[in-house]
Regions:
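Dinucleotide-binding Rossmann-like beta1-alpha1 core, especially the glycine-rich loop
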Residues: 1-46, 54-55, 202
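A short coil-to-beta-strand element that immediately follows conserved catalytic motifs
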Residues: 10-12, 86-87, 140-144, 208-220, ...
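Short loop/edge segments at beta-strand edges and connector loops
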Residues: 38-39, 72, 88-90, 217-219
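A short, glycine/Asx- and small/polar-enriched loop/turn
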Residues: 48-54, 96-104, 225-229, 236-239
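Helical element adjacent to the flavin cofactor pocket in flavoenzyme catalytic cores
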Residues: 58-121, 125
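C-terminal catalytic lobe of FAD-dependent flavoproteins
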Residues: 68, 213-289
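Central helical "cap/lid" subdomain
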Residues: 108-161, 189-193, 209, 273
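Active-site lid/adjacent beta-loop-alpha segment flanking the redox-cofactor pocket in flavoenzymes
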Residues: 153-239
Length: 289
C-alpha cells in the first residue's frame, strides 16, 4: 500500500468456524488458537446464521485482503514504480539451459514474435501452469468457481468458514462466496450451472438470509495442486532456477513468507531454523524418484 498508494482491503475482521456438534469442534486442527463460542455467542456474532450450527470457533487474529480487486492492482503499480517490466500476453515456450545451468527463457509475445530473455537467475512461480513450463514439477489444476452477492453494508462482519463453503464480507456489503473443488475439470474454463448451484446451496447452508441477494459476479480459477497438496519451494534440478509453486488454496496466505524464503535462497542469505524447516518440508526433491 505504501509503494502503490492503493488500499488493498487488508483488515483483521476475524474468522468464525461453525460446527453442528461439539465433537467436530474438538477435532478441528487449529482448535487451540480459537475462542470457543456457545450457541448464544455464535448467534450474537452472526445474526441470521443457519440454526443447524450449534457451536463455533472465533479466530480474532485472522482477517482478509481484497486480492482480486485491489491487491493485484497495487502490486502491479508498486512493481512498476520500482523498475519491474511486464510482458502481458506473453507465453513461456521453453527454458534455455546449458550443462544444466539456467540461461533464460524463450517466449512467444502477444504479437506472435518468438523472443528470448537471458538472465542469471529465475523463479518459476506460474501456478497451475508450472508443469507445462518445467515438467519436473508435479502440479495439476484443481478448478474452483466463485460468485459474489450484494448485501447491506455491515450486515456481516466476520468471515464464515464452513466445511464446504466460505463467505467473505467486504466493506461495501459485497460478500464473496467460495469455492467449488473440481479435481477432474482440468483447464476447462467458465462457470457451470452445477458449480453455481453448489455455491448457492452453500450460502443457504451457512447464511440463509443471503440466499436471495442479487448475484454481482461469477468467476473461476485454477488452483495449483501437488500430490501432497503442499507447496514446492526451493532449488530445482537446473542450477539458478528456483521454484515457488503448488500452493493450492494458500497462495495469497503464503505469498509473503514464500517471497522471503525465495529471496534468501537466491541471495544466498542464511536461513533461520524455522525457515530451514520450511525448506526441508517443501523441497522439490520429495517428488523425485
Amino acid at each position: 500500500r505504501s509503494d502503490s498508494g492503493i488500499d488493498c482491503g487488508l483488515k483483521k475482521c476475524g474468522i468464525i468456524v461453525p460446527f453442528e456438534n461439539i465433537n467436530d469442534l474438538y477435532k478441528f486442527p487449529t482448535l487451540k488458537n480459537g475462542k470457543y463460542l456457545n450457541n448464544k455467542e455464535l448467534n450474537d456474532e452472526i445474526k441470521g446464521l443457519n440454526k443447524k450450527w450449534q457451536h463455533g470457533l472465533l479466530f480474532e487474529q485472522d482477517g482478509q485482503i481484497d486480492n482480486r480487486r485491489r491487491l493485484m492492482r497495487a502490486l502491479e503499480r508498486a512493481c512498476s514504480q520500482h523498475g519491474v517490466r511486464f510482458q502481458e500476453g506473453a507465453e513461456i515456450k521453453e527454458i534455455i539451459s546449458e550443462k544444466n545451468i539456467f540461461l533464460g527463457v524463450r517466449l512467444l509475445t502477444a504479437t506472435g514474435e518468438l523472443n528470448s530473455i537471458l538472465c542469471e537467475k529465475a523463479i518459476l512461480c506460474c501456478g497451475a501452469w508450472s508443469n507445462k513450463i518445467f515438467g519436473e514439477v508435479p502440479i495439476q489444476p484443481i478448478k474452483g468457481q466463485m460468485l459474489s452477492v450484494q448485501g447491506p453494508i455491515n450486515q456481516l462482519r466476520r468471515i464464515i468458514f464452513g466445511p464446504q463453503t466460505y463467505l467473505v464480507p467486504r466493506d461495501d456489503g459485497l460478500i464473496i462466496v467460495g469455492a467449488t473443488v473440481e479435481k477432474q475439470a482440468g483447464f476447462n474454463k467458465g462457470n457451470t450451472p452445477e458449480g453455481i448451484k453448489e455455491l448457492q446451496l452453500g450460502i443457504h447452508s451457512l447464511y440463509p438470509v443471503a440466499k436471495n441477494w442479487p448475484h454481482m459476479e461469477h468467476w473461476w480459477g485454477f488452483r495449483p495442486a501437488t500430490p501432497d497438496l503442499k507447496p514446492i519451494i526451493g532449488k530445482s534440478s537446473i542450477r539458478n532456477l528456483f521454484l515457488a509453486a503448488g500452493h493450492y488454496r494458500n497462495g495469497v496466505l503464503f505469498s509473503a513468507a514464500t517471497s522471503k524464503l525465495i529471496y534468501k535462497l537466491i541471495s544466498n542469505t542464511n536461513l533461520n531454523n524455522l525457515e530451514k524447516r520450511f525448506i526441508k518440508k517443501f523441497k522439490p526433491e520429495r517428488f523425485y524418484k
